[in-house]
Design a protein with these regions (language model features):
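Active-site anion-handling motifs in enzyme catalytic cores
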Residues: 1-230
Length: 230
């Protein structure tokens, strides 16, 4: 495991990878640049698989899209091919995002487009030759009999699951969008859950993204789930 925090990747590894792309054929310089753990790790790989669930999306803004660019650029500058595992990309209406995407994505060895919309977004900026339409990786994984049995036993032993159950995925992303529209997302979810309870349903709250111990809402639905539950 190599420490590749965003600031370290952007301000240290990225400049070094540019130098490495020119100097890696000269043994003394290659050895010197490989003193950086990120450069050394990437340069020893046969292939790098980018497992971002979503990247190069207008709504993610300058910082996140720049980070997505650097994540792909550093290993490529180290001479290692990059494959983008099944993920969502686009839209590309923002100028900076479109510039970065058009520059780096055609150079990716293979882009697994997660769904037809992503494929169309990529085609809209002329990226087609290295794109393959794929399903979501998580939904393509085989079920584990071991965990399926554990879940089944949990459901059988818990009184909660002896009634009809509705699972509700509370989203911090949707909450943020509702706030911009002046809508009370938390209140709406509470009202909906109360109605389900009145119809004799138990409600199971699911945090799609969870960062235990974090008080920040990004990639963390635990906060809004807790607010709704309380």
């Amino acid at each position: 495991v190599v420490n590749a925090k965003p600031e370290r990747l952007l301000f240290l590894a990225f400049p070094l990878s540019i130098l490495y792309s020119f100097l890696r054929f000269i043994p003394p310089f290659r050895k010197l640049l490989q003193m950086d753990k990120i450069i050394k790790a990437y340069s020893q790989c046969d292939i790098v698989i980018d497992e971002a669930g979503i990247s190069f999306v207008d709504s993610r803004g300058f910082i996140m899209n720049t980070y997505a660019f650097v994540c792909a650029a550093v290993p490529m500058l180290c001479g290692v091919p990059v494959v983008k595992y099944s993920q969502a990309l686009g839209t590309f209406k923002n100028g900076w995002n479109k510039f970065l995407a058009k520059w780096i994505l055609p150079k990716i060895k293979l882009i697994c487009a997660r769904g037809k919309i992503t494929q169309d977004n990529l085609a809209g900026i002329g990226v087609t030759e290295n794109v393959k339409l794929c399903a979501d990786g998580a939904f393509s994984m085989p079920d584990s009999e071991f965990y399926a049995e554990k879940v089944q036993k949990l459901c059988e032993d818990s009184p909660f699951f002896r009634k009809r159950v509705v699972a509700l995925s509370i989203s911090s992303v949707v909450q943020g969008k509702c706030e911009k529209m002046g809508r009370d997302y938390r209140g709406c979810m509470i009202q909906f859950i109360n109605w389900l309870n009145e119809q004799d349903y138990n409600v199971l709250l699911i945090a799609n993204a969870a960062r235990e111990g974090s008080e920040k809402p990004r990639n963390n639905d635990l906060i809004i789930c807790t607010e709704v539950y309380n």
